């Protein structure tokens, strides 16, 4: 046993210090990024935000809408091959290039992933997703996927420390997914005592990834647009959002009614709700590590996406970054004891 003494920070612990700027308007800020990925060699450009691969958020409808904003969607792994075939058949290349094919790490998952990717050459992204990216089995699956799909962009995770980011990149990942426990419906930290404050994880993992020519995606912990800006400011190349995109028309959560008002259920993918839906219940040897919440219906995701992108542009304007890529170079974090004036509640 040992204790690391250094303080680790989450998004709520900091604000971004404003700096002099030559920008006259938020409209001058470009949010698009361009990447050439380490292993696949593929060039991609777009807004580096990803809808999370949760079965209520990472849906085909979400992918169709977010593609119009040049935003990615990690489509969840529970769609059947037939549903994928129907989606690919009706979708133009402009949508498919913004889709990530999510997979677990079983042999059946591998075979299904290969069948889905074979539906269209426009499907370029793979998202290998497990709760604990520190297992040897996970690394072996990643290596197998890289060998089988040399021209695909592979995003793999989740991890929170630099040495594991390096191992995943050296094993074939183009992008490493960073985050254990920060999600809005994740209870891993309270069930297991395991985790890492998200901002510090992003800063440390970005440093490790960029040294090897890889990228990271900050997954979890964002509850407002300012958190997204902090993630990019901390060095994240992509930011994955679940709760901020939940409860919209494009989601597939079950709708319930209480006292005449409708709500959509949103739950973590290790929650009892998710395991009952997909594997028949919680296995006797494990505990659920997610919760279920009821969200008021929020309409189309369009307005939420515009709000997030507007917040990002404004953050860039405050620090003089004309391109999103410059935000991390222009960011100085200050530690704070409060984030906002709550005399009239929170927005």
From Swiss-Prot:
The keyword Cell inner membrane does not apply. The active site is at residue 186. It comes from the Bacteria. Transmembrane segments: none annotated. GO terms for cellular component: cytosol; GMP reductase complex. Pfam families: IMPDH (PF00478). NADP(+) binds at residues 108-131, 216-239. Keywords: Metal-binding, NADP, Oxidoreductase, Potassium. K(+) binds at residues 181, 183. The keyword Metal-binding applies. Its EC number is 1.7.1.7. It catalyses: IMP + NH4(+) + NADP(+) = GMP + NADPH + 2 H(+). InterPro entries: Aldolase_TIM (IPR013785), GMP_reductase (IPR050139), GMPR (IPR005993), IMP_DH/GMP_Rdtase_CS (IPR015875), IMP_DH_GMPRt (IPR001093). One of its GO terms (molecular function) is GMP reductase activity. It is an enzyme of class 1 (oxidoreductase). GO terms for biological process: purine nucleotide metabolic process. Catalyzes the irreversible NADPH-dependent deamination of GMP to IMP. It functions in the conversion of nucleobase, nucleoside and nucleotide derivatives of G to A nucleotides, and in maintaining the intracellular balance of A and G nucleotides. Belongs to the IMPDH/GMPR family. GuaC type 1 subfamily. Homotetramer. This is GMP reductase. It comes from Yersinia pestis.
């Amino acid at each position: 046993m040992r204790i690391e003494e250094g303080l680790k920070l989450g998004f709520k612990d900091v604000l971004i210090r404003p700096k002099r700027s030559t920008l006259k308007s938020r409209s001058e800020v470009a949010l698009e990024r361009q990447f050439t990925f380490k292993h696949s060699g593929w060039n991609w450009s777009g807004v580096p935000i990803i809808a999370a691969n949760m079965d209520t958020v990472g849906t085909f409808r979400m992918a169709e809408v977010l593609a119009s904003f040049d935003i990615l969607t990690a489509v969840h792994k529970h769609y059947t091959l037939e549903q994928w075939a129907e989606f690919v058949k009706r979708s133009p290349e402009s949508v498919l290039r913004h889709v990530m094919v999510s997979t677990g790490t079983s042999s059946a998952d591998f075979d299904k992933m290969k069948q889905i990717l074979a539906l269209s050459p426009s499907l370029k992204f793979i998202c290998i997703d497990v709760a604990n990216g520190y297992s040897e089995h996970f690394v072996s699956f990643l290596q197998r996927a890289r060998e089988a799909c040399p021209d695909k962009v592979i995003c793999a995770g989740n991890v929170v420390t630099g040495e594991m980011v390096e191992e995943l990149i050296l094993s074939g990942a183009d992008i490493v997914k960073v985050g254990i426990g920060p999600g809005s419906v994740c209870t891993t930290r309270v069930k297991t005592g395991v985790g890492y404050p998200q901002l510090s994880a992003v800063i440390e993992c970005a440093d490790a990834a960029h040294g090897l020519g890889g990228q990271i995606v900050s997954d979890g912990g964002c509850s407002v647009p300012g958190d997204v800006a902090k993630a990019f400011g901390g060095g994240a190349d992509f930011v994955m959002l679940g709760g901020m995109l939940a409860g919209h028309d494009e989601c597939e959560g079950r709708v319930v009614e209480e006292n005449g008002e409708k709500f959509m259920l949103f739950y973590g993918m290790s929650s009892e709700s998710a395991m009952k839906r997909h594997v028949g219940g919680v296995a006797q040897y494990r505990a659920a590590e997610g919760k279920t919440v009821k969200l008021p219906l929020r309409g189309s995701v369009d307005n939420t996406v515009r709000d997030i992108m507007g917040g990002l542009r404004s953050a860039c304007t405050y620090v003089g970054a004309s391109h999103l890529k410059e935000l991390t170079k222009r960011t100085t974090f200050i530690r704070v004891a409060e984030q906002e004036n709550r005399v009239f509640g929170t927005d």
